[in-house]
């Protein structure tokens, strides 16, 4: 499979400003606020100018029940902190209450997370983007009829089901420290989805992901698990990730990839026990991207939230093929990043319990399993089902050039590299002084000038100003409805 280094690819990004308002409860390690921190940091790095930004639709119950059971989704829609006493039996049945608490807006949170992932899949299917990013997604532990590991609705499974409408084979890769059990379980008996998970194994949540778990029935050999021990570092991780993924690509030949970028595999994570730096983690993104396949990048775990924001901001830059400085720009959460206020983190001095012998032994066992695969299974031709999200209306080319563009349209536009330069005050990598960046008036063709008598009149400076683009800062929190 062809690999390319440093190829610029079109990126779209899903974010809803409300996502940071949801709160799992006091002392709970899962903090949706980290998504807002990530968004704010990448805004202040100026990355928003290089990609299309969309606000996800809220996925409805019908979309969710493409995988989840009806009664489970009905329960999630109904349960609230003030009526929990009425649902005590169902809470037990659906594993809601402790790790997966009931909180205000629980179902809306699931709708946003799922909406972004499903909309991303539709965008990729329509070839309207090369890479889609939804940091609010990646909730890989949720089961068909059960919440698990802080996850309620499995947005990944729903996004993959959407991709399967257009793609014969979809590859799922999971670099979260926890095993991607919910996704593996959903596709355990099919040969159209291969799941590959690199995770901590042995007396660690969720307890699954043994090397010998390889799939069943038609899906035999289509589940790949790389069990790891504490303290794995960048060098060891790269030494296993690249050869395993190269072999998987060669044997499975997917036409789309979903990458779950859980950042709890970073050094210093509140719940994790690996020793990866942000650069080491992002090398996985870079390597998968080099295969030049339609790619969905999702969030997942990550409980030292300042490092989550650092990691996902940097990985957004990697997707955009953009270098960003190590010096963090000033942002709304600047004090979180002290005392160094730098983007990158250093590894700790913890011992890497993954010896070269251990890693090599596991790698060879996985290679043996991968050799059992028939090369790229075929799929019977069928009519393509309807998309989960209706076609967007409106053609940009038909917009009236004399009308000020909406903020939604502004967010969707990607700035040319030459269109902006840093203001003197900000320096490299800083936010731009929006008053310095105005869009030139559209130049009319000779034919249009002939038809438009007004064009022959002299246009005053004041009239020109009305044609100018809205200020760049308007993009900050207003994002396009997907």
From Swiss-Prot:
The modification Phosphoserine is found at residues 393, 406, 409, 421, 423. 1D-myo-inositol 1,4,5,6-tetrakisphosphate binds at residues 27, 31, 270. GO terms for molecular function: chromatin binding; core promoter sequence-specific DNA binding; deacetylase activity; DNA binding; DNA-binding transcription factor binding; E-box binding; enzyme binding; histone deacetylase activity. Its cofactor is Zn(2+). Its EC number is 3.5.1.98, 3.5.1.-. It is an enzyme of class 3 (hydrolase). It catalyses: N(6)-acetyl-L-lysyl-[histone] + H2O = L-lysyl-[histone] + acetate; N(6)-acetyl-L-lysyl-[protein] + H2O = L-lysyl-[protein] + acetate; N(6)-(2E)-butenoyl-L-lysyl-[protein] + H2O = (2E)-2-butenoate + L-lysyl-[protein]; N(6)-[(S)-lactoyl]-L-lysyl-[protein] + H2O = (S)-lactate + L-lysyl-[protein]. GO terms for biological process: cellular response to oxidative stress; cellular response to platelet-derived growth factor stimulus; cellular response to tumor necrosis factor; chromatin remodeling; circadian regulation of gene expression; circadian rhythm; DNA methylation-dependent constitutive heterochromatin formation; embryonic digit morphogenesis. Residues 390-482 are annotated as: Disordered. Its main location: nucleus. This is Histone deacetylase 1. It comes from Rattus norvegicus.
